[in-house]
Amino acid sequence: MGRGLFAARKLMENRKKFRWSDRRFVRRTLGLAAKADPLEGAPMARGIVLEKIGIEARQPNSAIRKAVRVQLIKNGRQITAFCPGDGAINFIDEHDEVIVEKIGGRMGRSMGDIPGVRYKVVKVNNTSLRELVRGRKEKRLR
């Protein structure tokens, strides 16, 4: 490693070269997160419910977390989305149109004790799921 008066170019070249050893730099520079993301970098996406499923919570918790398999309209990809709220799954039927968003876990990953689920349902048939669960609104027919 040069330390002289004229070593700046070599130092800069080395920094540029060794940045590619940093996984976060590579993912950010090549835009890999957006390429792998089913939502394609968007904050929300529309989809059609394919089926309702129950997912077992991770240790030390013991529960069946209610979720749905959703096929996204924009690209046809299938994702699993969590249904937040007490009895929320009862307001969602197959073939309903839902809007999903990221669930908000660390580093864009899953959250809490729900393994492998990175998305949550926000709206059902253009009605807020939270309002449906609280009983303020009724689900509209599509």
Curated annotation (Swiss-Prot):
Q: GO CC terms on record?
A: small ribosomal subunit
Q: Which domain of life is it from?
A: Archaea
Q: Tell me which InterPro entries the record gives.
A: NA-bd_OB-fold (IPR012340), Ribosomal_uS12 (IPR006032), Ribosomal_uS12_arc (IPR022863), Ribosomal_uS12_euk/arc (IPR005680)
Which Pfam families does this UniProt record tie to the protein? Ribosom_S12_S23
- What biological process terms from GO does the record include? translation
Q: Which UniProt keywords apply?
A: Ribonucleoprotein, Ribosomal protein, RNA-binding, rRNA-binding
Q: Which GO terms describe its molecular function?
A: rRNA binding; structural constituent of ribosome
Q: Which NCBIfam families match?
A: PRK04211.1, uS12_E_A
Q: What does this protein do?
A: With S4 and S5 plays an important role in translational accuracy. Located at the interface of the 30S and 50S subunits.
Subunit relationships = Part of the 30S ribosomal subunit.
HAMAP family for the chain: Ribosomal_uS12_A (MF_00403_A)
Q: Which family does it belong to?
A: Belongs to the universal ribosomal protein uS12 family.
User: What is this protein's name?
Assistant: Small ribosomal subunit protein uS12
Give the species. Answer: Archaeoglobus fulgidus (strain ATCC 49558 / DSM 4304 / JCM 9628 / NBRC 100126 / VC-16)
